[in-house]
């Protein structure tokens, strides 16, 4: 299904570019801390930021953050539709609501009318933990069909009010259910999809669940924006999201290839690979770098890398594609590799 383009400030959700987003986890009344985190997220490559607006005083965040960063800001609104109206009046770029907990139809209409007049898109955010009681009773659990029925009901309500600048998310903490729901949703509507696995957990498990739940959908051509949800620093969410896009060829940058090591490895490859990864994290080059333990893996198995290093007995060779260009001691190899990367 062809995606209906939806504009968000200077961005367009149309499938041509996948935007990485995150959400502030500072207290809503901590203006200085929230601004500092927003700046850190933008520096890390976050394309869209979201903040909770739980009460009227939190509205002060909007102007403070927008004055400090350039990327779009999304207000996360629950229960009180008046906060959505006030956020729009203060210049918010996008609003995330669950129409099911905003209140009466008239209140949803008020939000839709306000956003339409200002060109503000709305994300319908449906989660497995907040489905309507009648839908849960119908399906017995938050099945993919239940999630999609809820989302479609909210979509039709906004469309009824002549509003179609819509982005949709239908998140579950169950990875397989999440994937099935998004695949079904893509068949049912043309609106841009915001991908994510909700309540994914702490860093290690959350990263694995998100890589599977988000990455598999992106490989199917599904999804226009992603958020990796982690019980951790939001900057890590952004870096994880960017790495997922790199891994499936949806984002440029340095891609590191390294072997798991074995009994043939005679250098500290694990330490070396970590140093290379950390050093190249912010390098703006669209290249693949291989760090391999022995000549079996590199340059042989890593011949498709633009440049790489293969360990020997206390030494290492550096190669471009499948050609060796130099041999160095283990101590010199790291610096020599960086020097060759700089030439690319």
Task: Give the residues covered by each predicted segment.
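Active-site mouth loops of central-metabolism enzymes
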Residues: 16-33, 52, 71-79, 135-148, ...
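Hydrophobic faces of well-ordered beta-strands that scaffold small-molecule active sites
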Residues: 18-24, 49-51, 73-77, 95-97, ...
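Hydrophobic or amphipathic alpha-helical targeting/insertion segments
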Residues: 82-123
């Amino acid at each position: 299904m062809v995606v209906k383009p939806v504009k968000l400030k200077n961005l367009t959700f149309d499938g041509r570019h996948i935007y990485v987003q995150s959400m502030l986890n500072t207290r809503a009344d901590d203006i200085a801390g929230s601004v500092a985190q927003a700046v850190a997220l933008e520096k890390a490559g976050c394309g869209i930021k979201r903040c909770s607006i739980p009460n009227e005083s939190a509205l002060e965040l909007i102007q403070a953050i927008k004055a400090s960063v350039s990327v779009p800001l999304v207000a996360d609104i629950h229960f009180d539709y008046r906060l959505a109206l006030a956020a729009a009046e203060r210049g918010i770029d996008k609003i995330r609501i669950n129409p099911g907990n905003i209140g009466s139809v008239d209140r949803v209409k008020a939000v839709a009318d306000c956003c339409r007049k200002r060109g503000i898109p709305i994300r319908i955010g449906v989660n497995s933990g907040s489905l309507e009681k009648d839908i849960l009773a119908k399906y017995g659990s938050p099945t993919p069909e239940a999630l999609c029925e809820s989302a479609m009901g909210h979509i039709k309500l906004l469309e009824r009010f002549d509003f179609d600048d819509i982005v949709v998310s239908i998140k579950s903490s169950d990875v397989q259910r999440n994937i099935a729901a998004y695949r079904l949703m893509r068949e049912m509507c043309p609106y841009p999809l915001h991908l994510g696995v909700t309540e994914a957990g702490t860093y290690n498990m959350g990263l694995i669940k998100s890589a599977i739940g988000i990455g598999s959908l992106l490989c199917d051509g599904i999804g226009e924006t992603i958020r990796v949800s982690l019980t951790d620093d939001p900057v890590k969410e952004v870096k994880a999201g960017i790495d997922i896009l790199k891994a499936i060829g949806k984002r440029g940058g340095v891609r590191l290839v390294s072997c798991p090591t074995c009994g043939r490895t005679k250098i500290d490859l694990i330490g070396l690979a970590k140093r290379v990864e950390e050093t190249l994290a912010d390098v703006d080059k669209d290249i693949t770098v291989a760090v391999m333990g022995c000549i079996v893996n590199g340059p042989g198995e890593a011949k498709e890398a633009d440049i790489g290093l293969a360990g020997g007995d206390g030494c290492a060779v550096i190669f471009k594609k499948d050609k060796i260009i130099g041999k160095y001691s283990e101590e010199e190899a790291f610096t020599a590799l960086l020097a060759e990367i700089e030439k690319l």
